């Protein structure tokens, strides 16, 4: 991705500023304890260990806009309904010349999403500067924090530094977390401070946290002063560095956590900060190489990069929560699929498949909830698939089963992986379809069929009969399951019942004669009406009722722009949701305006929010918004819809120079480049997710090319249809087809 113009944003009269050196680099600067409005600590995470850091590279225990601070470790729970266990937070003390500095005089904080690394630069008086570099390692549960002390002029004596690991769960006094017991000890042979712990929570957890440094240190083994300290003597032009390593392992991660900790100790001592960071960056290099976009809108690109970073840092070994902090890291199948779609369309399909694999693994529990008459997944799934939600009418949601099926099916559409379809996707899809058929489809005396009374979207209230959103999801589940069965060569009378149910549900979709509505008799506006186009592509773009419904919601979007009846704006994940729906129509102007509206609400570190408007702010680092945004921007550039691939379909006409590399359905990749308003490259090649590819029809707007620009090999495949050049593409092994 290209370098972007440096962008300065004045935040307040006290010279705070946010800088953008590239779409990956997010920097803010300030003085003292003066933070910019709506500052949220940036996130470093590897999907297990999740930590937000402040401007000194430490942590405060304060909750802002429902942001969660402290060291979190996904999967370690106090109870089924309770929070994740608290693993404390990091503090420090810096002193020299007889003064201890609680806060720096000046500070700069940078989150580099390219390398998943944080850099803080702090000035303490006029003589000392401290640079902090931090990674949460992508492959290991290791946190590495390097402090570099620089003397700006001769110091009056040594600098005393202490890294303190505060295990307290309270900001106003020392109090150990509930049901957690710690035993710190200094291991002189290993030169490490090892903290063994036992936690009695949802499971019984036993583990070890080890602190060590790459320089001689003094250890404080007391629980209230736990940490490592040392004195350093930097001179002008001769900085001194020390790296603190924090190693985590427990019985949920491995059967022998003590051995894993020893392996980690050997690794950090052999590699040091630079070696660990290089290994870490190689993993992130691979992730960033999967999809590439270069677009002329700097803010859209920055939000895109931030969205992918957010999705990758919250990709747990189980699946994708709305964030490891929000909602205690539980897994909503609805939000999980939003994350899935963002990862899938950005070509991170090996990571994306964790969602359908998680649902396959927890399928036995989902079936047990219906006495084996279909799969009913928990509303807020724990890591074992069991329910983590408190009682409420949200338990009457059922559309999340169609989200589960959608992710499972979409993974096959992208990869063309028959083994995956047979072993993972189809069993999940079939049981979700059985659930809808046997539990939720109501047959009426006149032969019609509707979905029973359920909670559709929470803002619409409970007990809505024949809801549009849920009905479209059921239709898509039925129809995609039947398609999967045909691909696998399976025959069963049950599949005929699925097809029949889908056909009958189509006939009873609620409408007012002009447009589809959320449920019969509904008088309020709701985003529910866009779902027949996205995320469930069950309706044709020629369906006038759906088109009018989507445009009506677009026109009235600020009347129902949040999941909850709060605020007066359009939340970013709704904006991206509508943009995805409108991308199916090639509506460039509206899609672009919605993407810009979503992107305008990201934070200083490109984080996406659940809500971020003038008077309401909720849940920063909200992965649902990140997933919706990434997928929506991908769809404006390359829209996949069953057997059709639309190239630059909703890309703004005013964009004259841009390029992208994105995955296509059928296990293919499109590498596209537009220069001076003309297509100069469109290479279709086989992707790497399976050994085969499926033929697809590619559509390219005619304003981007002429017949003379079409490649000789592609010319026989070309057909001109209604303002588009149409190419039917089927690739052999190793083949790349250049349409230009």
Language-model-derived ranges and their functions:
Residues 250-252, 322-332, 373-423, 431-499, ...:
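The feature captures the catalytic groove of carbohydrate-active enzymes
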Residues 18-52, 58-330, 361-364, 731-740:
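Acidic/polar, glycine-enriched structural segments that form the non-catalytic walls/loops
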Residues 1-4:
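Positively charged n-region of N-terminal signal peptides that target proteins for export
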Residues 22-148, 588-739:
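Non-catalytic C-terminal accessory modules of carbohydrate-active enzymes
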Residues 329-365, 397-418, 423, 467-641:
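Active-site core of glycosidic bond-cleaving carbohydrate-active enzymes
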Residues 8-17:
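Hydrophobic h-region of N-terminal signal peptides that target proteins for export
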Residues 245, 410, 429, 434-439, ...:
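Structured mid-domain segments that build the active-site/substrate or prosthetic-cofactor binding neighborhood
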Residues 276-289, 295, 299, 318-325, ...:
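Short coil/turn segments at secondary-structure boundaries
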């Amino acid at each position: 991705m290209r370098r972007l113009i440096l962008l300065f944003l004045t935040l307040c009269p006290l010279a705070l500023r946010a800088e953008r050196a590239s779409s990956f680099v997010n920097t803010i600067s300030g003085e003292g304890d003066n933070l910019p409005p709506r500052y949220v600590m940036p996130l470093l995470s590897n999907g297990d260990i999740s930590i937000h850091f402040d401007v000194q590279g430490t942590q405060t225990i304060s909750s802002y806009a429902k942001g969660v601070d402290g060291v979190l470790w996904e999967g370690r729970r106090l109870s089924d309904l309770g929070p994740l266990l608290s693993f404390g937070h990091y503090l420090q003390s810096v002193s020299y010349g007889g003064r201890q500095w609680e806060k720096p005089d000046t500070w700069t904080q940078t989150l580099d999403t390219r390398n998943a690394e944080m850099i803080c630069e702090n000035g303490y008086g006029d003589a000392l500067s401290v640079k902090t570099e931090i990674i949460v390692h992508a492959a290991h549960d290791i946190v590495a924090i390097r402090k570099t002390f620089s003397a700006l002029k001769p110091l009056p004596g040594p600098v005393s530094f202490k890294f303190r690991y505060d295990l307290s769960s309270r900001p106003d006094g020392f109090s150990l977390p509930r049901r957690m017991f710690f035993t710190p000890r200094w291991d002189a042979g290993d030169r490490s401070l090892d903290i063994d712990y036992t936690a009695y929570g949802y499971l019984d957890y036993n583990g070890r946290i080890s602190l060590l440094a790459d320089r001689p240190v003094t250890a404080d083994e007391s629980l209230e002063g736990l940490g490592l300290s040392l004195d350093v003597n930097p001179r002008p032009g001769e900085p001194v560095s020390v790296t603190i390593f924090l190693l985590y392992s427990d019985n949920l991660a491995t059967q022998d956590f003590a051995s894993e900790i020893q392996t980690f100790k050997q690794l950090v001592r052999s590699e040091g900060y630079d070696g660990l960071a290089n290994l870490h960056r190689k993993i992130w290099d691979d992730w960033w190489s999967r999809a590439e976009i270069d677009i002329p809108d700097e803010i859209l690109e920055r939000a895109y990069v931030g969205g992918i970073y957010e999705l990758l840092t919250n990709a747990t070994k189980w699946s994708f929560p709305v964030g490891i902090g929000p909602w205690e890291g539980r897994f909503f199948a609805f939000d999980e699929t939003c994350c899935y779609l963002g990862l899938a369309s950005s070509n991170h399909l090996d990571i994306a498949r964790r969602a359908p694999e998680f649902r396959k693994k927890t399928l036995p529990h989902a079936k047990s909830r219906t006495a084996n008459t279909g799969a009913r997944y928990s509303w807020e799934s724990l890591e074992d698939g069991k329910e983590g939600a408190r009682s409420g009418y949200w338990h009457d949601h059922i559309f999340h089963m169609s989200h589960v099926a959608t992710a499972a099916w979409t993974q096959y559409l992208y990869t063309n992986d028959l083994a995956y379809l047979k072993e993972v996707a189809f069993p999940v899809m079939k049981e979700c379809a059985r659930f809808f058929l046997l539990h939720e489809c109501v047959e009426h005396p006149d032969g019609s069929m509707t979905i029973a009374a359920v909670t559709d979207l929470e803002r619409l209230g409970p007990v809505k009969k024949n809801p549009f959103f849920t009905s479209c999801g059921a239709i898509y589940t039925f129809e995609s399951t039947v398609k999967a069965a045909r691909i696998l060569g399976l025959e069963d009378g049950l599949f005929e019942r699925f097809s029949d149910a889908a056909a009958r549900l189509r006939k009873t979709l609620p409408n007012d004669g002009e447009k589809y509505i959320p449920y019969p008799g509904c008088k309020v506006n709701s985003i529910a009406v866009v779902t027949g186009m996205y995320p469930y592509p069950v309706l044709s773009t020629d369906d006038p009722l759906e088109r009018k419904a989507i445009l009506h919601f677009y026109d009235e979007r600020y009347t129902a722009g949040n999941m909850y009846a709060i605020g007066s704006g359009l939340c970013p994940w709704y904006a991206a949701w509508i943009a995805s729906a409108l991308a199916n129509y090639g509506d460039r102007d509206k899609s672009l305006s919605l993407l810009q509206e979503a992107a305008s609400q990201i934070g200083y570190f490109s984080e996406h929010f659940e809500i971020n408007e003038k008077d309401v702010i909720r849940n920063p680092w909200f992965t649902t918004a990140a997933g919706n945004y990434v997928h929506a921007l991908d769809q404006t550039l390359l829209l996949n819809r069953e057997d059709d691939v639309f190239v630059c379909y909703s890309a703004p006409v005013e964009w004259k120079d841009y390029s992208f590399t994105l995955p296509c359905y059928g296990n293919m990749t499109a590498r596209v480049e537009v220069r001076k308003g003309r297509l100069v490259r469109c290479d279709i090649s086989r992707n790497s997710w399976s050994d085969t590819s499926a033929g697809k029809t590619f559509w390219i707007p005619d304003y981007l090319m002429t017949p003379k620009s079409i490649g000789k090999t592609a010319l026989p495949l070309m057909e001109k249809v209604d303002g588009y050049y149409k190419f039917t593409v089927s690739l052999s092994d190793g083949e790349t087809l250049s349409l230009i």
